[in-house]
Regions:
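Short glycine-rich loop/turn motifs that provide flexible caps or phosphate-binding loops at active sites
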Residues: 1, 38-40, 125, 137, ...
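Residue-level marker of positions within ordered structural domains that often coincide
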Residues: 2, 85, 102, 139, ...
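Glycine-rich, phosphate-binding/catalytic loops in enzymes
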Residues: 13-17, 54, 138-142, 182-184
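Internal, well-ordered alpha-helical segments in soluble enzyme and binding-protein domains
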Residues: 16, 43-47, 76
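Rossmann-like dinucleotide/flavin-binding elements
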Residues: 22-67, 114, 133, 154-199
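A Rossmann-like FAD-binding core segment of flavoenzymes
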Residues: 53-146
Length: 199
């Protein structure tokens, strides 16, 4: 289905500006730029560290919670915490982005509103998978809060014979359950199942 199909939008004034992106693929366009990152999950942390290391003029994280996400990869968390504590990456906790302008953004927190210089907003707010292809193929989806596709965990095969799934889609809307590091064996399970069934 592709994981990066339907972004969770901010639904704030200015989100339609060209400087607002919901997907990150490289740091070079952000060199010597003032970057704002919305979110505190693995993607937001990775983007903050990458843009900081590749020469962004400033990196500011806007985080709704009191701290960095609890599900951050354990080998990355100390790095982002240290960068924030040292001031190399700024973090506005218990805050939200309320408006995006051409050259600035407005952040709201319990202390009021603050307008800061900004060149790009990277909204790492997550995505919803597109279930259309699965539904067209007849794959059943659990009727729970995460809308997890039904599949055999040992083969990765869905309820439809010959239709397999792998990666992030296996977690449905719980998109932080599976990532590259912990889903590498999905393809091996699929190949093994296909090999057994074709011999």
């Amino acid at each position: 289905t592709g994981f990066y199909d339907i972004p969770y939008l901010l639904n704030i004034p200015g989100e339609e500006l060209d400087k607002v992106l919901h997907y990150y693929n490289e740091s070079h366009p952000y060199y010597q730029m003032n970057i704002a990152i919305v979110g505190a999950g693995n993607s937001a942390v990775d983007v903050a560290l990458d843009t900081y290391r590749k020469g962004a003029k400033s990196v500011t994280m806007i985080i709704r919670e009191k701290e960095i996400g609890k599900n951050i990869k354990y080998w990355v968390k100390p790095d982002i915490v240290n960068r924030i504590e040292s001031g190399e990456i700024r973090a506005h906790y218990e805050s939200e982005l309320i408006e995006i302008k051409e050259k600035t953004i407005i952040i709201k927190s319990s202390n009021g509103q603050k307008e800061i210089e900004n060149d790009f907003v990277l909204a790492m707010t997550g995505y919803q998978p597109n279930y259309n292809i699965l539904k067209k193929l007849g794959v059943k989806i659990n009727n729970d809060e995460f809308k997890t596709p039904i599949f055999n965990e040992s083969t990765m095969e869905t309820n439809v014979n010959g239709v397999f799934i792998a990666g992030v889609i296996c977690g449905g809307l719980k998109t932080n359950k599976w990532f590259i590091e912990n889903s590498r064996d999905h393809s091996k399970k699929i190949i093994s199942s296909i090999s057994k069934n074709s011999s």
